[in-house]
């Protein structure tokens, strides 16, 4: 049994893949709780797609992919915010238009300028081809985001629940808003190499959704989201070794399965609470 567990660790590429999956899981999990609370799940989706033209342009210009992806992600967020403030359309409609437009522009650029960048690696990542340098860069981003959230999570929480009260309390709403957007963009850049554009959406939504189904206190949700993300990410890479499948989709399948379990468990728990609350008054 122990040999079955340790077999994947005999290969350096598997060790690197598990390491990068854990490193990526931490900032994604922390941010996912805020995204779910604010109703910004589609924002993570939009920014994940929007970085595509940034990656292609970065290749054309000859700059690091991370810079192009970060700028494109911020451009998507700023454009969405501007249109949201200056039009009568709902935010989800605006985000759908912006991210589909930017993703389409990325595809046009990708076809127009032949490059050595593989589309599959951009969309789905290349976790098994991760280098130690990639792990180092991703770890730096993860530490920065974890440190910011660790120091300012109460401010971000108040801004997420009640921006008006946050402003009245002396907090700078604009700084918190765009700071959160910057962290989302940075996290997407970190996930780009490992899980790709498409599958980063799951990492930015599922851990927070699962945690908020199971616990009530915010700090507990943060901790549980991180634990869930690390477990599913590392477990998905390990399981992919035996299933002979790609790690990133396997991770997403684990997240989905765990979400179903969490949903069923929370539904049963809530129904039992309702029955208990109905029995107690009658008994009194």
What are these regions (language model features)?
Residues 2-16, 87, 94-154:
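Transmembrane helix-bundle core of multi-pass membrane transporters
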Residues 17-20, 65-73, 92-96, 139, ...:
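Loop-to-transmembrane alpha-helix initiation sites
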Residues 50-60, 97-109, 129-130, 173-183, ...:
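Small-residue-rich segments of transmembrane alpha-helices in multi-pass membrane proteins
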Residues 135-207:
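Helix-loop-helix "hairpin" substructures at the membrane interface of multi-pass membrane proteins
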Residues 198-249:
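Transmembrane alpha-helical segments in multi-pass inner-membrane proteins
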């Amino acid at each position: 049994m122990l040999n079955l567990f340790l077999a994947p660790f005999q290969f350096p590429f598997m060790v690197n893949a598990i390491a990068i999956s854990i490193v990526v899981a931490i900032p994604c999990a922390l941010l996912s709780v805020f995204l779910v609370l604010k109703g910004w799940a589609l924002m993570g989706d939009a920014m994940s797609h929007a970085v595509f033209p940034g990656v292609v342009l970065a290749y054309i210009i000859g700059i690091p992919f991370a810079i192009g992806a970060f700028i494109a992600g911020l451009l998507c967020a700023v454009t969405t915010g501007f249109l949201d403030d200056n039009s009568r359309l709902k935010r989800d409609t605006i985000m759908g238009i912006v991210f589909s437009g930017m993703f389409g522009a990325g595809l046009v650029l990708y076809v127009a300028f032949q490059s050595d960048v593989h589309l599959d690696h951009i969309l789905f990542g290349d976790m098994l081809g991760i280098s130690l340098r990639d792990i180092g860069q991703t770890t730096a981003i993860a530490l920065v985001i974890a440190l910011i959230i660790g120091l300012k999570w109460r401010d971000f929480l108040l801004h997420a629940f009640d921006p008006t009260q946050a402003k009245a309390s002396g907090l700078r709403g604009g700084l918190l808003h765009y700071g959160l957007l910057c962290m989302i963009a940075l996290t997407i850049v970190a996930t780009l190499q490992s899980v790709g554009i498409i599958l980063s959406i799951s990492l930015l939504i599922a851990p927070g959704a699962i945690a908020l189904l199971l616990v009530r206190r915010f700090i507990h949700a943060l901790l549980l989201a991180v634990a869930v993300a690390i477990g599913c990410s590392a477990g998905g890479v390990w399981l992919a070794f035996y299933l002979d499948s790609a790690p990133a989709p396997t991770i997403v399948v684990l997240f989905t399965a765990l979400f179903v379990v969490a949903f069923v468990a929370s539904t049963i728990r809530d129904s039992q609470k309702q029955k208990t609350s109905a029995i107690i008054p009658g008994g009194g």
